[in-house]
């Protein structure tokens, strides 16, 4: 029973990793070297009070609609099962875990960035780092954990396994990107 639960957690982590990786690949194609939709023709909501809440990031039309789409995709299971706090907690916690993976994989596989640049350079849209990683990653993990803690605490042990597996998969992907890196691109998108 314990091994079956562990395998289920590994499968869940793998699914969230693949979903995050695919979203990262899509965003690399859309944004190129310019994260946070910097060069995209999209609206931006950025009053000073909002920028204080978001660590200096405007809300872009691109991100608003993409995240709204993902919100509905993640809630699709509610078409088949009755709403419950436990199901909603799982949906929200899973979204936050996948979101950290999605963003990190954008840096890992983006030819204009890569893991070395991610760890060593300042990222304009992530001005605060803690132990080499944007503070938002820790917030995502915290929101994921706290959602389960508040709505379905019996799932916390499962969450720990899924989160640990996701961290491992992200580390393996970062290592793999160093073994077979893509061609690095400069700021203007041309090879360095």
Question: Where are the regions a protein language model picked out?
Answer:
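Aromatic-rich, lipid-facing transmembrane alpha helices and their immediate juxtamembrane interface loops
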Residues: 1-192
């Amino acid at each position: 029973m314990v091994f079956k639960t562990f395998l289920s957690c590994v499968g869940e982590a793998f699914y969230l990793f693949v979903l995050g990786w695919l979203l990262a690949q899509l965003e690399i194609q859309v944004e190129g070297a310019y994260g946070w939709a910097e060069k995209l023709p999209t609206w931006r909501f950025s009053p000073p009070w909002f920028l204080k809440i978001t660590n200096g990031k405007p809300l872009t039309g691109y991100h608003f609609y993409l995240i709204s789409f993902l919100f509905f995709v993640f809630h699709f299971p509610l078409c088949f099962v009755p709403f419950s706090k436990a199901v909603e907690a799982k949906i929200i916690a899973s979204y936050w875990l996948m979101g950290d993976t999605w963003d990190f994989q954008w840096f890992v596989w983006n030819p204009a960035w890569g893991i070395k640049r991610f760890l060593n350079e300042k990222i304009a849209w992530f001005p605060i780092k803690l132990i080499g990683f944007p503070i938002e990653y820790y917030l995502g993990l915290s929101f994921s954990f706290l959602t389960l803690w508040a709505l379905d605490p019996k799932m916390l042990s499962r969450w720990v396994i899924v989160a640990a597996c996701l961290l491992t998969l992200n580390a393996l992907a970062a290592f793999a990107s160093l073994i077979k890196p893509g061609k690095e691109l400069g700021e203007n998108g041309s090879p360095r």
